[in-house]
Amino acid sequence: MSKTIAINAGSSSLKWQLYQMPEEEVLAQGIIERIGLKDSISTVKYDGKKEEQILDIHDHTEAVKILLNDLIHFGIIAAYDEITGVGHRVVAGGELFKESVVVNDKVLEQIEELSVLAPLHNPGAAAGIRAFRDILPDITSVCVFDTSFHTSMAKHTYLYPIPQKYYTDYKVRKYGAHGTSHKYVAQEAAKMLGRPLEELKLITAHIGNGVSITANYHGKSVDTSMGFTPLAGPMMGTRSGDIDPAIIPYLIEQDPELKDAADVVNMLNKKSGLSGVSGISSDMRDIEAGLQEDNPDAVLAYNIFIDRIKKCIGQYFAVLNGADALVFTAGMGENAPLMRQDVIGGLTWFGMDIDPEKNVFGYRGEISTPESKVKVLVISTDEELCIARDVERLKNTK
């Protein structure tokens, strides 16, 4: 009985999913939140049940111990040795990791060094990897990188128009993110359309709290909206997305609360986007409630959000010289029909038309009309399954 855990560890959280492999059956899933803070929360879902505990969890090692003990306590596994592999989501792999890899000491050290590219994500991932290696040293640990899928971009696409020494000396370039999600939904889109992925031109829109759009040509990423860090691209839940970089020194000069570039970047990452403009929330459901109340700040935030996403999708029609399908995925992409309606409403010139009933009530699958030249699909992303598959593929190669 081979079981694999897919892990997404953040700075203060550890999200997990346990699979029976190779059957790809989900046995249990959960999340541990507020790691390092008082009143940490551990949630376990299995067999239609939900168990929640309030604990004091001081670090990721303690979180992993609690997770594993819960698996035994709730009868999900009988012993640790049933787990044969662990897969870790890592946001930034830089140019070092073009595909998923089995973890060793050198890989872990490189992931920590790459934290400069994803300071909000890589340190937590490294902590999760260390914790599992300490507690389950004999099982295979695999890293799956958000950036790997985008290493197929051409040099003229991933380089910024600044002196090349900043790339050669400091590796400043576009890396992208959400690659595992974009790869998965492109594969699923090909199945849904009944055509080989190698023949398709797709635009995949991962729209959650983080937002990224990718141009997929014959199964390869040829451009993506996130850049050197996941801050780039369209407006997001709490992130600004693209802004004029000259704003950064200007704000440091003008606002005494912003003392340096790090303060401004923190504001752009955590206090901007839907949340910053609306003053309400980063959650689209709260923004839509504000629309119903004619809240002017909610209306403004929503309009900027739609405008930025439409522009990004439009430019990828140019990159691909047309597209066979547009795919919506992730939290908002899958669950916000009003957002999808308003995005498509500004792209009808490209030959897209959605069925209003399918858009609102269909939830998953094709929501475009039969006459639509470009198919519009809603596909649930499953990054955890992608991670588990890579563990299964690599666990006998270490």
Curated annotation (Swiss-Prot):
Cofactor: Mg(2+); Mn(2+)
Organism superkingdom: Bacteria
Pathway membership, UniProt: Metabolic intermediate biosynthesis; acetyl-CoA biosynthesis; acetyl-CoA from acetate: step 1/2
Key words, A-Z: ATP-binding, Cytoplasm, Kinase, Magnesium, Metal-binding, Nucleotide-binding, Transferase
Gene from which this protein is expressed: ackA
Protein name (Swiss-Prot/TrEMBL): Acetate kinase
Natural source organism: Streptococcus pyogenes serotype M28 (strain MGAS6180)
Database matches in SUPFAM superfamilies: Actin-like ATPase domain
EC number assigned by the record: 2.7.2.1
Active site residues per record: 146
